[in-house]
Amino acid sequence: MGLLILGLGNPGLEFSLTRHNVGFSLLDKIVSKNGLFLKRKKKYEYSELRVISRRVILVKPLTYMNLSGSLFPSIFSDFYMCIKNLLVVLDNVDLPLGKCRLKERGGMSTHNGLKSISSVLGSSNYSRLYIGVGSNVMRDIKSFVLSRFCKDEIDRLEKLYDFLSDELIDISESNFKDKVQKINSSNF
């Protein structure tokens, strides 16, 4: 079984290091840590690695967050994957900074990126990794998720990304529950 890790974010330098782009940042860490390079297709950038005999595909959409679903179903056929191979990495304003929640399957979400994906797929039956970006102390959630991290927050997240980059690439059906326990109990 392969794994397709889809990191959510918004394209463009103006969005780098924002709370909404933690999915992109984690994938960038996995790419650099494994000496990989991103290749470009029409709607996304991707990289591929092998872990033992499993293929792991890393994908960063070139669409804005709210249009993430437009990658499907073509991305599945491009890499010979299906919904059970999908792991979406995204921000979560309800989790404290440095805390994660890995879920095997999920219900509908208020996150617009997930709404877009679930709407196109006709299902929310895929895995997700929520990365806490801190509590929303501002009234306007859009302003909050598009705000940049401060230096101390970036330092904490770098440690988290380092940890997650090792944990995610060898995730499988047989060790998923162990990974949930390890990732969900971590705090950076």
Swiss-Prot record:
Its EC number is 3.1.1.29. Gene3D superfamilies: Peptidyl-tRNA hydrolase (3.40.50.1470). Keywords: Cytoplasm, Hydrolase, RNA-binding, tRNA-binding. The keyword Cytoplasm applies. The record marks 91 as: Stabilizes the basic form of H active site to accept a proton. One of its GO terms (biological process) is protein quality control for misfolded or incompletely synthesized proteins. Its main location: cytoplasm. Monomer. InterPro entries: Pept_tRNA_hydro, Pept_tRNA_hydro_CS, Pept_tRNA_hydro_sf. CDD domains: PTH. It holds the Pfam family Pept_tRNA_hydro. It is found in: Cytoplasm. TRNA binds at residues 15, 64, 66, 112. Hydrolyzes ribosome-free peptidyl-tRNAs (with 1 or more amino acids incorporated), which drop off the ribosome during protein synthesis, or as a result of ribosome stalling. Catalyzes the release of premature peptidyl moieties from peptidyl-tRNA molecules trapped in stalled 50S ribosomal subunits, and thus maintains levels of free tRNAs and 50S ribosomes. This is Peptidyl-tRNA hydrolase. The active site is at 20 (proton acceptor). Coiled coil: none annotated. The record marks 10 as: Discriminates between blocked and unblocked aminoacyl-tRNA. One of its GO terms (molecular function) is peptidyl-tRNA hydrolase activity.
